[in-house]
Amino acid sequence: FRDEFDNDKLIEQGRFFYPIDPLDFYLPDPSQPGRNSAPPGWLESNVVQIVDPDHYWFDPSGRTLHLVMRLHLANSGYAAVLKVTEQGDTPGTGEMITSFEHFPSGGECRIIALPGGQMKFHILYDPCTKLYWLLSSQTTDSMTKAQHMPADRINLPNNERHRLVLHFSKNLIDWCFAGVVAIGQTALDARHYASMMIDDQDLCILSRS
């Protein structure tokens, strides 16, 4: 990430919301004591495959996967994306090359809009409905000044962990709200770091609390 990230320039993958000291691991904003955060980066990847032949990023050979990752820049609603291409003659074989995806214009695509992309999320494809399901944390006040946050909120304003929600999409880009999974009674009652699996017509969800 540091090879691609330059805090002094507004570049394609975004810019950290607060000023940071690259030598200080946990201090994005020295003016807000107690409101610290891990350093910026892309992490906690989801491995997905695009199976719709009409999609711009569809690979008819079946050898392309996409990594959709938490975009930790202290903002909310975005995720990072990378493309992984298998070099073998058949899917599942050969060396795997990681690169950036591209827009139809030819420009590199490094970030996409994704509800809850600022925290760990889980994407699951359902072949029956042909939909991607997204389990993620809902942020409600990421633009509140850090010094004005309630005492029971940890770290930065976008780091809200007690509202777990569900979305669905047919293309990984356009997400529709499906419903609320769980809400903790207070900001300290976390409902996040969740995962899910399909059981016939049901979604089984496991969540940190």
What residue spans do the PLM features occupy?
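Beta-rich carbohydrate-recognition and catalytic domains
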Residues: 1-44, 48-115, 126-131, 137-187, ...
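Conserved beta-strand position repeated once per blade in WD40 beta-propeller domains
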Residues: 44-46, 120-122, 193-195
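Internal helix-turn-beta structural module
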Residues: 192-204
